[in-house]
Structures are given as C-alpha cells and as structure tokens.
A protein has these predicted regions:
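Topology signature of small-to-medium multi-pass alpha-helical membrane proteins
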Residues: 2-172
Length: 172
C-alpha cells in the first residue's frame, strides 16, 4: 500500500491568515463610561459657570464676586458655553466610536486636544484677569495648571497609540 504524502501541492490547503485579536477594554471603557461621564461633567460645569454658582461659597455669592470682579462674568459665560459644546462633542465622539465610523479615532484625538486647549485658555484668561486685579497666581496654582496640561497630553498620547493600532477597525 502506497503512502500518500501531503507534500503534493494539490493536497495542500492555503495557509490561513491569523488575525491577531486586539484587546478592546480601553475602547469599551471610553464608550460606556468615560465619554458619557465627561459629557455629564461638562454639563455640570457649564451650569455652575453660567449661573455663577461656582462662586456660591464667596462672601455675597456670585453677585458679590461679580460686583467686585466683573471681568470674571464674561470668562465664566464663555467657559460655560464651551462646556455645553464640549458635552455635545463628547456625546458625538462616543457614538462615532461605538459605531466604528471611519475617522472616529481621529475625532477622539481632536476631542482630547480641544479639551486641553479649552482648559488652558480658561486658566490663562483667569490668570490674566486676576493679574489686572492685583492678584498673582501662586506657585501651587501654576504647578496645577502645568500638571493638568501634562495629564491631558499624556491622555492624548495614550489614545493616539491605542487607536493607531486599531484604526483599521473603524471603516463603516
């Protein structure tokens, strides 16, 4: 009885391509938790800044604070409006990611950068207006602003690396 050999090219099957499954835990955290909580946080902050309740603990409340420092009202109204826009941006980004839409990862990166930029603009305006009233920022405040910027940029880099490896999945 002759042995059949699998070395015959006719008997060989093409090698199956193995597609490496990438873990999606960070993705799930983003779409089911982080972006939703970010939107809620932005709306909450927008409410506090638009109503002046952010200064509720000040003597005389918001009215007393704004009477003494009227320029802060304009900054807070701008920041409150930005909070509403950022909340909508977070929700939109979440649904684009969840739907695996083309360009959704780059949209998330734009959201990350926009968040950092809006926060830094607020703090720069706050520092500038404070200086016009003779109040200089403390070293602790400056360090906290630098830390916020650093954390925001680190978060951006993590997302860039994570979604750079998964960009091919977002093709709808």
């Amino acid at each position: 009885m002759a042995k059949t050999s699998n070395t015959n090219p006719e008997n060989r099957q093409p090698a199956k391509k193995t597609v490496r499954q990438l873990p999606m835990n960070w993705f799930k955290f983003l779409i089911y938790c982080q972006l939703i909580l970010t939107a809620l946080s932005e709306l909450s902050n927008a409410y506090l800044y638009l109503t002046g309740r952010v200064y509720a603990q000040e003597p005389g409340g918001a009215a007393g604070f704004y009477a003494q420092f009227p320029s802060f009202r304009i900054i807070n109204l701008m920041f409150g409006a930005a909070g509403i826009i950022m909340a909508a941006f977070a929700v939109y980004t979440r649904f684009q990611l969840a739907g695996f839409k083309k360009g959704a990862p780059s949209l998330l990166l734009k959201f990350n950068l926009t968040t950092v930029v809006v926060t830094m603009i607020y703090h720069i305006l706050y520092a500038f207006v404070s200086a016009t009233y003779g109040r200089m920022l403390t070293g602790r405040e400056i360090m906290s602003y630098i830390a916020l910027f650093g954390i925001g940029m680190a978060y951006y880099m993590v997302n860039k690396s994570y979604f750079g490896k998964r960009e091919f999945m977002f093709n709808r």
